[in-house]
Amino acid sequence: MLQRWLGAPKLGKPRRQRPQRIARYFDCTWVTAWGEERARVSSLSLTGCYIESRFSVPPDGEEVRDLTIALPTGSVNLQGTAVNATSGVGFAVRFIDIDTKTQKSLSAFISVAQR
């Protein structure tokens, strides 16, 4: 118990590191069966984001196509899967198939934004 309080590392399984995440607002768009939707991203990491959308919330597991996030360094185009959807609030997107260029630009932006 004293070791935990002092911040000593625990023995056993190492903890999985959580992805770096920034909590800022960015405009975004994505394509649904009904056309282009507009909303804002409130949390962003290398593995996903949270989109606040009161009107258009896809069900869990649905593919989010052509997601474009407008960052100060330029827009990034991504795709992913909707998770943790809450109607009238928003949903998380778990990114899939990120190309190397997008990964590098997203990583560089997140590193700078966390300083």
Regions found by a protein language model. Give the residues of each.
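Short, charged/polar, Gly/Pro-enriched secondary-structure boundary elements
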Residues: 99-104
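Short beta-strand-centered aromatic/proline hotspots
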Residues: 39-40, 78-83
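Short, solvent-exposed secondary-structure boundary/capping segments
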Residues: 50-53, 86-97
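Residue-level recognition of beta-strand microenvironments
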Residues: 44, 83-85, 98
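N-terminal helix initiation/capping motif
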Residues: 1-46, 54, 107-115
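Short conserved beta-strand and strand-loop elements enriched in small hydrophobics
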Residues: 26-32, 62-75
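Surface-exposed connector loops and short turns at secondary-structure junctions
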Residues: 55-63
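Short acidic/polar mixed-charge low-complexity motifs
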Residues: 35-37, 72-76, 89
